[in-house]
Amino acid sequence: MAGAGSQHHPQGVAGGAVAGASAVSPTAAGPGEDSSDSEAEQEGPQKLIRKVSTSGQMRTKTSIKEGQLLKQTSSFQRWKKRYFKLRGRTLYYAKDSKSLIFDEVDLSDASVAEASTKNANNSFTIITPFRRLMLCAENRKEMEVWISSLKSVQSREPYEVAQFNVEHFSGMHNWYACSHARPTFCNVCRESLSGVTSHGLSCEVCKFKAHKRCAVRATNNCKWTTLASIGKDIIEDEDGVAMPHQWLEGNLPVSAKCAVCDKTCGSVLRLQDWKCLWCKTMVHTACKDVYHPVCPLGQCKVSIIPPIALNSTDSDGFCRATFSFCVSPLLVFVNSKSGDNQGVKFLRRFKQLLNPAQVFDLMNGGPYLGLRLFQKFDNFRILVCGGDGSVGWVLSEIDKLNLHKQCQLGVLPLGTGNDLARVLGWGGSYDDDTQLPQILEKLERASTKMLDRWSIMTYELKLPAKSSLLPEPVAATEEFYMTIYEDSVANHLTKIVNSDEHAVVISSAKILCETVKDFVAKVEKAQDRTLENTVVAEAVASKCSVLNEKLEQLLQALHADSQASRVPPGIGPAIPEEDTVESASDESLGESKDQLVNDIGKPSSQKAVKPREIMLRANSLKKAVRQVIEEAEKVMDEPAVQPSEPVSPSCDYDTETDEAKEDDAKESLSAKTTSQSPDAQASCGHPQTDSVAGPAMATTKENLPVLNTRIICPGLRAGLAASIAGSSIINKMLLANIDPFGATPFIDPDLDSLDGYSEKCVMNNYFGIGLDAKISLEFNNKREEHPEKCRSRTKNLMWYGVLGTRELLQRSYKNLEQRVQLECDGQYIPLPSLQGIAVLNIPSYAGGTNFWGGTKEDDIFAAPSFDDKILEVVAVFDSVQMAVSRVIKLQHHRIAQCRTVKITIFGDEGVPVQVDGEAWVQPPGIIKIVHKNRAQMLTRDRAFESTLKSWEDKQKCDSGKPVLRTNLYIHPAPDLATEEVSQMRLCSQAAEELITRICDAATIHCLLEQELAHAVNACSHALNKANPRFPESLTRDTATEIAINVKALYNETEALLVGRVPLHLESPHEERVSSALHSVEMELQKLTEIPWLYYILRPSEDEEPPLDCTKRNNKSTVFRIVPKFKKEKAQKQKTSSQPVQNWGTEEVAAWLDLLNLGEYKEIFIRHDVRGAELLHLERRDLKDLGIPKVGHMKRILQGIKELERNPPNLV
């Protein structure tokens, strides 16, 4: 349609045409399914509408709802903006709110329906006996508010913005216009819907069909939501109330079969036969009365909240659920705007599968209403259908209500990026709403893992640009570094004299030697340039010689002392050799140092040197350093002297040495710094230098800091403009005391202090600053301005490519390293030339890219994981790198792995920042990323799905008829023997004791409660099912569930206490928990002697070896039903299986089960076929036994051949 004269268009409509009203072929939809769109309809003959002055009526009546809407005209389907007022049961509209004349529409016999399935333009139709009014709202929330207002008028109920939609509790249908691909009949007049494509209305919840003229006469019998909505159909017995079937007549699929007589039911000629809205059972009209009256709720019964469970309301007006009816209910949040408005289709489909009261639209009220409804449940699951932003929204609301211990959250990817859904195993996109039952089934079988969540803390303050922080007189920096030299020498001498620990003495002596040696080299290098003042140069050389002598004397005294002391073997840690090559002039000093280090750890019987002698040597060495500094200051005071280059510190910590080196750094820092506010930390009074900010500090071999090889990837160092030198110990010592830029201390004096910070948001996936954030910001702005251009994932990826290409030319943040400063775990990280920094929590970035460049650990970094409380920091060099990383796993840009990240933004202008795809411009100041909490996430467990599917195939009925949905336990389980009951009781008591000890310890150790809450709740719930006063109530099903949950609790507790990163408890609690854990282990070992529990609790063949405590913690709360017992008993039972010749009929029947031919067990047992006869069966024998299928004969004969070679193990 041209629509040239249209002045206003609804969102998502181009040229005035209705996006959701375009013509669609009947073949566009599958058989029996509703199509996505409806054809445009012209308004029929209209009744003459009275147009008079309505100002009087406007003043006398109260307005229920009013506002601007777009109205479709009859000419060329153009849209025009009109002002609408709903007063009483009449809808008024005019050009604006101040008009005197309004058109009026009588709503006495009106119905309201959405325009189409996807409804991208948020349009709806008001249908009266005389006209149809097509209206369009600004967004979906506004549309639903208008629809609810109109429905409340029809039902004669006062409209108010309630907690839930009125139609959910009133039984009113939720109409939308659609077309059908097969003959469909109206459930009101029972006649066929007219037209080739069967135009009509369909209820989005119960699929009730009606003509548009009949919709107003439809009874309010939509899908039940609460106990009150069931009414007189409720079933009451001695056990309480039960859920009845809710039948809907007619319009059954072609393949429908009666659940009673197993014959075809339904018709394409008339409205006949019935279908239950809950369990999807279909029956003939004649068979309906003989069918079981209680509804089993069907395939999704685990996830459904039955209407009989919502039987009361609390003081706030929210429905209260009865927990006994809900095992693990599912709360569904759908973002109706996600995936090109695909969310609308999923919203309707979930209401058809579940209770409509447990399905919520995030765009209409947010997640609070749903979480408030489920707040009282001890354990429930959440499914978020949308993108990463929707998941973050729900998790933030869970934080406010403090529900992390009660709920596990799964993700159905409908958005653009969907990085979190990829990591959790749910894929990158999902479009097929017909597969939702299978998705719910996989969600029931999902395992649980913990997702680290991080707070983005900001502190805004004005910081001068780095370039303005360069010092005017370079000599001031020299004096500052010389003071640091002197203080460092004094600190390490104090440690050598006072410390009784050999590790501290070794570390301090080694650092002291290198400090003095490097200090002398720097001074000599400076005096070599001082050719004019030879007298001063000779004085400096003399003082340096004296200093070397004093250091030699101290080393000799320490050597003598080490020879005299007795140290137990092995207590001295090995000191790794330095990679640097010692100069020829320092050979004697290096030998003395090595001799000292080697001798301190050796036992000897010589007489100890007096501590006073060591003290004297140390004081003389300190005085010598002071004299050299004084002479050096004289050199710098000479006007003709060229100042020497300032010492550039290094961050090359040797992580192989003892932790005493870190302690030295912290102690020396604490002696110089006090707790400061972020403002004071960011503007320290020391002179500032910048290794990249200007020509005075160009990146050269002498002043470029060495990057920590344990933190920085060698590839990033190769990306730096020059080779890195200065790797002596002096650089390590300097970085423990000063910051090369002088802007912040190298180690934050109070790293955990967040005074003055405010939480900007919470990060679940990743954080970015610079290039990638600017691209995200521009994309978000474009999507807000032109949403119709960003309605599909393909278009969004194309836009990202266009914006990235533009940045390739503009290079807006090519000097980002000059505007920001990075610290990881309080350690300053010198940055190369880059355009952005990314901080990763999950191994998926910007739509599925593994930006870290791998998933496995190597010699430097551990494997990335989202449950280890560790972040990965990478550099973003340009947009080409971001594009290439989608194809090639790049690793040269890795920076660090750390637990906290601090980024300081300098200058007057803000820098783009993005968190999980949401971008903004962050003003200058400080950004800290710290751990907030952990959320329980549902991850798809494909291995468990495969195993369970194989098990379910073996549990098919003997008749060979496949079940609709095989549950974990199909047949009534037999009772337990007396010995088995007693063993289960002992195991339950041991598990209860372990739970008690865990709860006691959790009162002090919050982490214990956070890690084990899910396992403890599941185990307690299973134990409560077994009533100790009635042993006969303990069935095999209940016992199996108890054993699985107790084993899961045992695995989780053991992994937490003795796993890769053990949790250290206080001594009384640790002993009690360990004792209870040991008791549970003993009881579980006894349970493995029960044959039907052996295969559940036995060790797996491919079980992983014991965890290495030195490796990274990758544990999760996934159900580990395989214990860590030794395998001797399993091997013994395997080898003790009897030969095939001695098999009885029971073993033969079990062997048929292994072949998935259990339907022939009765035949073999009736003919008394034992092992000896089985081995001699031939094809004609099987035919005589009554096996008709050739394929089954071949499988049995092939199985007999396998028996002769490898007899199976049948326990």
From Swiss-Prot:
A zinc finger (Phorbol-ester/DAG-type) spans 172-222, 244-295. Residues 1143-1206 form the SAM domain. It is found in: Cytoplasm; Cell membrane; Cytoplasm, Cytoskeleton. Phosphorylated. Phosphorylation does not inhibit catalytic activity. Residues 1-66, 562-613, 634-694 are annotated as: Disordered. Widely expressed. Detected in the granulosa cells of the primary and secondary follicles. Expressed in mature follicles and corpus lutea. Expressed in the oviductal epithelium. In the uterus, strongly expressed in the luminal epithelium. Detected in the uterine glands. GO terms for molecular function: ATP binding; ATP-dependent diacylglycerol kinase activity; protein homodimerization activity; zinc ion binding. Its EC number is 2.7.1.107. It catalyses: a 1,2-diacyl-sn-glycerol + ATP = a 1,2-diacyl-sn-glycero-3-phosphate + ADP + H(+); 1,2-di-(9Z-octadecenoyl)-sn-glycerol + ATP = 1,2-di-(9Z-octadecenoyl)-sn-glycero-3-phosphate + ADP + H(+). Residues 19-32 have a biased composition (Low complexity). Residues 325-460 form the DAGKc domain. Its main location: cytoplasm. Residues 576-589, 653-662 have a biased composition (Acidic residues). It is an enzyme of class 2 (transferase). InterPro entries: ATP-NAD_kinase_N (IPR017438), C1-like_sf (IPR046349), C1_DGKeta_rpt2 (IPR047480), DGK (IPR037607), DGKD_4H (IPR054474), Diacylglycerol_kin_accessory (IPR000756), Diacylglycerol_kinase_cat_dom (IPR001206), NAD/diacylglycerol_kinase_sf (IPR016064). PROSITE patterns: DAGK, PH_DOMAIN, SAM_DOMAIN, ZF_DAG_PE_1, ZF_DAG_PE_2. Keywords: ATP-binding, Cell membrane, Cytoplasm, Cytoskeleton, Kinase, Lipid metabolism, Membrane, Metal-binding, Nucleotide-binding, Phosphoprotein, Repeat, Transferase, Zinc, Zinc-finger. Belongs to the eukaryotic diacylglycerol kinase family. This is Diacylglycerol kinase eta. It comes from Mus musculus (Mouse). The gene is Dgkh.
